[in-house]
Each structure stands twice: as structure tokens, then as C-alpha cells.
């Protein structure tokens, strides 16, 4: 990774910090592993905004990532490391011995030419995917399944990982980077290692136009709006004189937002405790 701080030749370049990966493949992705991605602009089928601050952005094609690691006990060689516009981490193209190709998340430290594998009896090696019951305590993991066979859902963004803490009967306990301790079934799979491109957090876009290219629209403060648009709006000056609330009048800043009580029993310790 190379971190480049741009010279202040203009106000838009003054604060820009780029994270450059010199080993990224510069050609086109594999066409058979691409899908069309339709933008919604944060709207639902009625045309109403369901997610704010989304809209515009550069056109993207979705890279089909193999979160399940479908081909067991078939060695695969890492062909190249590629950029993926749909996620913060990079991806790698792997070629299986049976001739199949797949995209998977890039484990930190993987190199072109490395051999990786998935299955129940594969060794504990960077990039290998296997059931958590076969992995020793203290191992760093990523792309962890919540439900066996569904594919990895935990620790998939750039630089993220989880650590295996303990094993208890049919469940293991992992510690996430947020500090949360969570139970995972022993049959669920995980990949050895940490997700690559951990320097992604150091980048600074530097100007509003760069955010718009990523499809991020401006975030306007409630106190800067009119009373018709937000409970904090209107008045003389900037003081809104009440407890902070959302645009719909619900309390914010500290209010619990988790609703899925069914899976609450799998959380041993919450991240904020």
C-alpha cells in the first residue's frame, strides 16, 4: 500500500489523501462473474425515500463474490488481485483445479500464485475456509457465517476481522472488532486471516464532488432546515432547545435501535458494555 498526500494546488486537492495499491490488476474483470446493478436512489417501489443521502454516482457492475466457497477439497491458485467498486476491500480471482473461476475477498498478506482451499479437513492456512469447530482458539477469522451454508456475513469490510475466543458445546464465541462477543454454531464456516486493504480508513476524499461519485448525497443538519422539514428547524439562531430527535420525531443519540429479539440470545456481550 502507498499513501499519497496530494499537493494543495487547489482547494479541492488540499486535503486529499489517496491509498494506492500498486499490485492491483489493471485490466477488465471476468465477464461471466459480473451482474448488472440497478440504482434505486434510496427509493422504494412507490418512489418514496427509504434511505437518505443516496443518489447518483458512477455506474457499477456487481462482482459475484463466492461467500460460500462452493468447491470443497479442490485446490485453487490466486490469479490476480482486483479492485471492487462495490466494497471497501479488494477481491482476488482464483482458478480452481477443475477449471472453475471465482471471486473471493482478499485476505491480508495473500500473494499471486498462492494455493488456497476450502473443506472440512483443509489445513489452518491464510485464505483457507473451513468449519469453525476445526479452527484453534485465538485464530483471526473473516467472512464468518451466521447460519451454516448461507455464506459469510460477518467481518467482510476492509481491515475487519474477528477472533475465536472459546468453544462451548455446539457454539463457539468470537470477539468482533467492536468489542461484541457473539455465539456462532460450530458448523458455520469462516476464512482464516484478516480482510486486506486495511489502510482504506486513511483515505480522505477531500471534496464534495468525490462523495457524489460514490453515490453519497449531502447530509443536512436538522437545525439548518425549516420547521416544516425537521423538528429542530426554524427559530432565531442555531439553538433548537429540545432533546435531539430524528426527522420523524423519534429520540436519537443513545436510543436502542436493535429490534431482532430472536437472535439476542447469541450476543454474549454488546459492543457498548
UniProtKB/Swiss-Prot annotation:
Identify the domain of life. Bacteria
Q: Where is this region: Disordered?
A: 221-263
One GO BP annotation is: cytoplasmic translation
Q: Where are the transmembrane segments?
A: none
Q: Does the keyword ATP-binding apply?
A: no
Please name the SMART domains in this protein's record: Ribosomal_L2, Ribosomal_L2_C
Entry's Gene3D superfamilies?
Answer: 2.30.30.30, Nucleic acid-binding proteins (2.40.50.140), Ribosomal protein L2, domain 3 (4.10.950.10)
Family annotation (InterPro entries): NA-bd_OB-fold, Rib_uL2_dom2, Ribosomal_uL2, Ribosomal_uL2_bac/org-type, Ribosomal_uL2_C, Ribosomal_uL2_CS, Ribosomal_uL2_dom3, Ribosomal_uL2_RNA-bd_dom
Keywords (A to Z) from UniProt: Ribonucleoprotein, Ribosomal protein, RNA-binding, rRNA-binding
Q: Which GO terms describe its cellular component?
A: large ribosomal subunit
Q: Which GO terms describe its molecular function?
A: rRNA binding; structural constituent of ribosome; transferase activity
Stored Pfam families: Ribosomal_L2 (PF00181), Ribosomal_L2_C (PF03947)
Q: Where is coiled-coil annotated?
A: none
The biased composition feature labelled Basic residues covers 252-263
**Purpose of the protein:** One of the primary rRNA binding proteins. Required for association of the 30S and 50S subunits to form the 70S ribosome, for tRNA binding and peptide bond formation. It has been suggested to have peptidyltransferase activity; this is somewhat controversial. Makes several contacts with the 16S rRNA in the 70S ribosome.
Question: Subunit arrangement?
Answer: Part of the 50S ribosomal subunit. Forms a bridge to the 30S subunit in the 70S ribosome.
Its family remark reads: Belongs to the universal ribosomal protein uL2 family.
Q: This protein is called what? A: Large ribosomal subunit protein uL2
Instruction: State the organism named in the record.
Output: Buchnera aphidicola subsp. Cinara cedri (strain Cc)
Amino acid at each position: 500500500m502507498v499513501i499519497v498526500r496530494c499537493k494543495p494546488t487547489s482547494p479541492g486537492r488540499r486535503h486529499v489523501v489517496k491509498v494506492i495499491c500498486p499490485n492491483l490488476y489493471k485490466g477488465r474483470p471476468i465477464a461471466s462473474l459480473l451482474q448488472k446493478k440497478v440504482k434505486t436512489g434510496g427509493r422504494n417501489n412507490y418512489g418514496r425515500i427509504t434511505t437518505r443521502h443516496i443518489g447518483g454516482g458512477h455506474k457499477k457492475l456487481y462482482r459475484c463474490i463466492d461467500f460460500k466457497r462452493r468447491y470443497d477439497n479442490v485446490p485453487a491458485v490466486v490469479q490476480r488481485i482486483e479492485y471492487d467498486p462495490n466494497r471497501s476491500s479488494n477481491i482476488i480471482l482464483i482458478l480452481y483445479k477443475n477449471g472453475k473461476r471465482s471471486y473471493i475477498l482478499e485476505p491480508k498478506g495473500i500473494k499471486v500464485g498462492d494455493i488456497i482451499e476450502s473443506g472440512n479437513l483443509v489445513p489452518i492456512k491464510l485464505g483457507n475456509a473451513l468449519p469453525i469447530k476445526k479452527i484453534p482458539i485465538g485464530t483471526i477469522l473473516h467472512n464468518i457465517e451466521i447460519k451454516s451454508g448461507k455464506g459469510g456475513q460477518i467481518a467482510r469490510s476492509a481491515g475487519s476481522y474477528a477472533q475465536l475466543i472459546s468453544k462451548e458445546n455446539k457454539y463457539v464465541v468470537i470477539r468482533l472488532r467492536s468489542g461484541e462477543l457473539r455465539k456462532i454454531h460450530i458448523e458455520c464456516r469462516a476464512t482464516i486471516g484478516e480482510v486486506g486493504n486495511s489502510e482504506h480508513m486513511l483515505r480522505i476524499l477531500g471534496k464534495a464532488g468525490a462523495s457524489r461519485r460514490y453515490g453519497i448525497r449531502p447530509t443536512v443538519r436538522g437545525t439548518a432546515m425549516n420547521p416544516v422539514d425537521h423538528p429542530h428547524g426554524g427559530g432565531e439562531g442555531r439553538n433548537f432547545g429540545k432533546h435531539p430527535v430524528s426527522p420523524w420525531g423519534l429520540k436519537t443519540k443513545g436510543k436502542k435501535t436493535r429490534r431482532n429479539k430472536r437472535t439476542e440470545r447469541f450476543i454474549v456481550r454488546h459492543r457498548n458494555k
